[in-house]
Amino acid sequence: MEFKKRIRIISVKEFRIKFSTEENCLDYLAKLRWPNGFVCPKCQNQESYRQAERGFYRCKACDNKVSVIAGTVFHSTNLRLTDWFWAIYRMAQDKKGFSAMQLMKEIDVAYPTAWSVLHKIRCAMEERDKQYHIKGRIELDDAYLGGKSKGKRGRGAEGKVPILVAVEKRQTRNGTKPGYVAIRIVKSLSSVEVKDFVDSKIVPWSIIETDALSVYGILDDLDFVHESFVTENGIKAKELFPWVHLVIGNLKRFILGTHHHADPKYLRLYVSEYCYRLNRRFHEDDLFEHLLKACLLISPRKHNILGFRKNSL
């Protein structure tokens, strides 16, 4: 298989040809994991023998046996890599979201297996996005997701999960446009949660625009420039903060449209999926490869917090 040029997925047909066998998938994973050739994690030697066993290499210097999928999202998997690659491809290509029910039908596996595969991929998305921060002029707002109650709407709505959403507001010749996005599910809408969110996701001395809700007052005491706006006298919040409201609206439609039966326990992973894809909307041609790399980088321990049974995949 040729690796001199980055693969750009154009069609399902092309994908099926390039990754039609386990061997093709293993070769591609090895190229991504060791772009300059095999490196033994034990002695740093670069010479190895390819083993007949699935994805294993043996170091010529110290005889260390290394698996290309060890320590990744594919660690100890019993599922074919061709099916894993297909799931990652579908997650990368489908802007509206991809459900476990769809994957179950497409690769002919049990629903729990399809569900686990997609959630492990979402864990990789979540871990990857934790490394990045947003900066510049930021719109910051809160919202509520989910809930079956038809009672109170808006802030404090019953049975709903609070979130904080921050969106870069980039200047253009004709006005502004949204940049990168950060979203977090919080236990409650409080000053403590606001502080923790902005400290971990926004570069210091960025300009943060909010409404006049009291919990945002904490920003005045932090290393940011805080601009607070009172949304009254006919001025609507959507007019003052158009981009963050657009992101919130699209997030709600994403969850209701594809994951409307989502367990609140895993809601953060659906939010992570939405945020990951949104932040890479300008690099859609490369999204499959980026997501595959994210799956190689995540530790197996990270996705075990979801309660997956060992060797269930």
What are the residue ranges of the model-derived segments?
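Residue-level recognition of single "structural anchor" positions
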Residues: 1-313
